[in-house]
Amino acid sequence: MVDGFARRDFLKAASLTAAAPLLSVTAREAMAAPQAVAPSGLLPFGLSEVALTEGVFSKKRDLVLAYARGYDVNRLLQVFRANAGLDTLGAIAPGGWEGLDGEANGNLRGHFTGHFLSMLAQAYGSTGDPVYLEKIRTMLGAFVECRAALRRDPQVLSVPGKSGRAVEQVRGSYQYIDLPAEPLPAMFTFTAWVRPSHDANWARIFDFGNDNTRYLYLAARNGSGVPRFAITTNGPGGEQGINGTAPLPLHEWSHVAVTIAGSTGTLYVNGVQVGTNTAMSLNPAALGSLAHHWLGRSHFGGDPVFAGALDDVNLFSRALSADEVTASLKGDLSSYPFDETTGGTLADASGRGRHATLRRTWGGPSHPGFLAAYPETQFITLETMTRPDYQVVWAPYYTAHKILKGLVDAYRNTQDARALDLADGLCDWMFSRLGKLPAEVRQRMWGIFSSGEYGGIVEAIVDLHTITGKHLELARLFDLDSLITACAENRDVLEGLHANQHIPIFTGLLRLYEATGEQRYWLAARNFWGMVVPPRMFSIGGTSTGEFWKARNVVAGGLSDTSAETCCAHNLLKLSRQLFLHEQSPKYFDYYERTLYNQVLGSKQDRADPELPLMTYFVDLTPGGVRDFTPKQGTTCCEGTGMESATKYQDSVYFRAADDSRLYVNLYSPSVLKWKGVTITQTTGFPVEQGTTLRITGRARFDLSLRVPAWAGEFTVTVNGVPQHVNALPGTYVTLSRSWRNGDVVRVRMPFGLRAEHTPDQPLVQSLMYGPINLVARDARRELLELGLYGRAALSGDLAGNLQPVAGSPLHFRLGEVALAPFFEGTEDAYHSYFRRAEPKIVFAGVDSGVANPVRADGSTFLDEVWVAAPFSSRSAFLDRVTAVARRWVGEGLMSVADHDRVIRTARSAPMR
C-alpha cells in the first residue's frame, strides 16, 4: 500500500517554494509579484498514517465500507461501456442520476462513478484491503478499454442472431448503421428481425430521408407504444402512416416488414398483417434522392437511437407478398445478414456492393484523451449556451471533475500508472477545447447556473500538476473573474448564487495560489469563507436553502425541508482544512469540528444497505422534519461526497510542521498516528466522553499543540498525571514542548456546556449546542417548540442544569417533556433542530420571582441582558449584574420598583452555583 498523496505532494511543493509570508486581506496587496507559495510550514498526514479506532466515526465508516466491498462496479461502468459501444457484461446501471433513465435524460451520468472510485481509493489508502484494490483495477481497466474504443471508429458488437449472428446496438452507445444512399423505387419492401432492449418511443428501426421534412421511417414504437411506418415530404404534419396494433416485445426477436405497392402500404409483424393504408399518395420514389439511409437513427434530434439487436435486414425493389415476407429471401437492393464479428463495415450480400458502416451520431471525440459516460456533445453545446437548461446540458465539467478526481485519488493511493495516464489525457482533452475559446466565452460558460458548474475541477487539476508538472494553464482557464474579484475585494455577492456550484471553486483557488502565488486567489478564498461562516451557516454547519444562498445573516429565514445541501458541508470542510494549512486560525477547526460532528456524521443513516450508500441530500430543518437517506434513488452528488467523507474522516485529526517540529491535534477522535518513529494513540469516547487521552510510544522531541475548542469553558491538561499550566483560552491552541518518552500519557479534560445559539435574523429562533454537538428535539409536531432555559442557568452561563440525562443513552436528555438527542445519530425520527426561545418569567436557579420577563422593542429581554454578561466569577458578581440591569430597566420605565425589589430578593435567595 502506498501512503496518501497529500503528504507527498505537499512535501514536493515545500521543497520547491518558500513558506508563505503573513498575508493581509486587502485587495490592494494582491498586486504583489506572483510566485508559488507552500502552505505555511504545515502538512497533513496521508490516510495510511492515521488509523481510526473504535468510535462514532469508525462505526459510520464501516457501514460505507460494507457498501463499497459488496457493490458490483460493473454496474457503474455500464454507462461508460455503453457510451463506447462495448459489451456491458449484462450489468444493470444504477438508478437515479447515474443511469440513462435518470433526471434530465441521465445528463449527469458518470459523476457518481467518479465519487465511487475516490471512495475506493481512500478506502484502500486507509485500510490496505485488497478487495478495494481489485475494484479499482477493474475500473481503471474498463476506463482504458472505453477510451481506446472511443478513439477508434465504432466496432460491431456481435451477438447470437435469429439466424447466425446479429448486431447489437447498446443503449447509450449512440451508434447506428449508415447504409449507402440511393434513390428508392416506387415499389418497395423492407424486412428485418429486431430485438428491442428498451421501450423508448420513436426509436427508429430505419429512417431514410434528408431532414425532418422529407423521409420515410419505421419506428419500433410510436407515441402509443406500437410500431409505426410513415412517409412524408412535408414533415410530421404531412405524414401518411400505418400503425401496428401491439408493442414489439422487449428482449425477444420479432420480424417486421413494410411493403408499398401503388397506393397501398402494409405493415407486418411476424408475418401477420397488423396495419394497412390504401390511400397513400406517396411512395419512396416520390421522395427523390435522399441523403441518408439509416438503421437505428432518426432525423429528429430528440428521438432516441434504437437500442437492441438487428438481424437479416433486406431491401427489395418490389412489394413482397404476405407469403414472401417471412421467407428467407435476399433483398435485391441490399441485404445485410450482419454476421460480422469484428470491424465497423457490414457487408451487403445482395451482390451490389452496398456495404454499410457503423457510426456514432456524434462522430467521435475531438481529442484522444476524452473519457466520459456520454458523448462530447454536452461540452460542445455549453460553448454556445447563454442560459441554463440542464435538460440539454447538465454540468459536464462537474462530471469531468468527479472522474478526474477519482483517477487522481486512484493514482495517489495505488500508484497504478493507468490512472495517471487517464487523468493526464483527460486534462489534455479539456485544454484542447478550452484553450481555443475566447476568454469572454469561458466567463459566460462558468457563470451559467448548473450547466456551467465545474465543481472542484481546479483542485483536481492542480493536484495532478504537482505530480506531472503539467496542466497549470488549464487550471487557470476555469477562473470566474467576476466572482474572484468581488471576493478578493471582500464584496459579498453570494445572495442568489447556487451554493455548491461555487464553494469548491475556492478550494481550487487556494491550490492555484499555492502553485502561482497570485494573491487574488488567496484573498478571494479567505474572504469568501467569512461570507458563509457564520453569516449563512446553520447550527449543524451546513449552508444553503434549496441549494441557493439567501442574503447575509438570513438563517431562520432559510429553514426549510431543502436546507443544508450535504455537498456544501463536504466542500466547506475541504476549504476550511486548506485555509488552516496557510493560516493557523483555530476558527477553521472550530467550524470543521461543528460540521463534521453534526451534518457530515448525521448525513449517514445508521444502517447498511448493499445497494445504496444511505446518505442525505438536503437536511430538513423545519419543525418535525425527517431526514431522507435515499434521495433520487441513491446516486446523487451528495451521496457521492458522503461516501468520500466517510472514507477520510481521519485526514484532518492531526497536522504536522514541515520540519517535524510540531504536531497539531485538531480533532478529538480515537485514532493511531505513526510519525517520525513515534506512535501516538488517541483513546477517547468523544463526544460521549468529554476529554481524550494521548499515549506516546517511542521517543522524540516535538511541540504538541492541542486545540482548545471555542465552546470549551474549561480545558485542563495533565502529562503523566501532572497538571500543566497552560493558558487554555477558548478558540486557541495550547502547546506542550518537551522530549517525549515511551509511555508518556497526556490527558485532556474539556467539560461540555449547554448553550443556545440564536439566529441573526430572528434572535428568538435558536438551536441547542452541547459542547460541539447539536441536540435536536425528537418530536413530530410541525410548529416550533417553545423552550425556556434561563431558569436553570449556572454562574458560568452553562444551561446544562436544564437537562436530565437518559440512563443508558449517551447524549440523550430530557428537557422538561421534550426528548433531546444528538443530530449525528442517523435515524428517521422526526426532529427539531431549532426552537423558539420563550422566557415568560424571571427565574433564577429554579426560584420563580413571580415577575414577568419584560421585553424591549427590539425583542431582547431582561434576562437576556443579565445573562449576556456570563460567565460570572462569583455569586456576588452575578448579584451585581442583576442589580445593575434591574436599576437600568426601572430607569427606562420598563420595570416597576416593586418588580425590581422582587427580582433582587429572588436573586439573593437563589442557590446560584
Language-model segments: residues:
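Soluble extracellular-acting proteins and domains
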Residues: 840-913
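Flexible glycan-contacting loops in extracellular carbohydrate-active proteins
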Residues: 277-309
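C-terminal beta-rich recognition modules with glycine/proline-rich loops and embedded aromatic residues
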Residues: 525, 589-605, 609-695, 729, ...
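Trp-centered recognition loops
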Residues: 193, 246-257, 733, 741-743
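Low-complexity, Ser/Thr/Pro/Gly-enriched N-terminal "stalk/linker" regions
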Residues: 24, 32-112, 137-138, 142-153, ...
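N-terminal secretory signal peptides and thylakoid transit peptides that target proteins
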Residues: 1-18
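Extracellular glycan-recognition modules
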Residues: 153-164, 170-231, 237, 250, ...
